[in-house]
Each structure stands twice: as C-alpha cells, then as structure tokens.
C-alpha cells in the first residue's frame, strides 16, 4: 500500500524521531511510505497515495490548539474526499484527547475518512503503531 505521513510539528523543524519511527514500523510491514513536512512542502500530490496518516504535535500545553500548517495543508489540497486516513497526535499535555478530537474534526471537514486515531507517547510506541497498519 502507498502511504504518506504528513508530519506537522508544533514549530518548523525536521521530522521528529516519533515520525521516523512510525515510518519505520509501516515500512517493516511491506508498505511504501513517504514522509512529508507540512511546513516546507508545497507541491504535494496526495491523490497518488492510498492512505494518508497525519501526525500532529499540538502547539499549546493543554493540547487543544493545532499548528497553522494543518489548516493550510488540508484546505489547499484536492482529491481528499473519501480518502482513508489516520490521525495521530503526539502527547504534549494532560488534555491531548481534545487535541485529537480537533485534528479528526479538521480532517473530516475536508472529506477524509478517519478510520484510525491514536495518541503517540514516544518513538517505540509510534513504531509499534506503524506495525499495526493494515493488520
């Protein structure tokens, strides 16, 4: 399966270790996986992928506010309606569930079918989650 991971850290920086671990876990199951940084990539062809995984790090300590790159990347892409997707949120504070709910709402607003969501605790947890895709 062709999978794209859209990495949206709270600030502009290279993909964090948990994103690389998620990619490693998905690739170990035989999937073709690309990682895209939402802050720097502009020419993303999302319809070419069968599955879209969005992994976000909340910008507020309470975990409810999403980075501005999330809205920009989802609203400017076409071909997202009906696309199977996963929503992942890096645990940053006590109210991470609210942030995950906001992330899923943003994705579903653009027509994506979110069929998997989870809160990522650390890199080994992300790799274990990656191995569960398609299983």
What are these regions (language model features)?
Residues 2-10, 14-135:
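FMN-binding flavodoxin-like domain, especially the glycine-rich phosphate-binding loop
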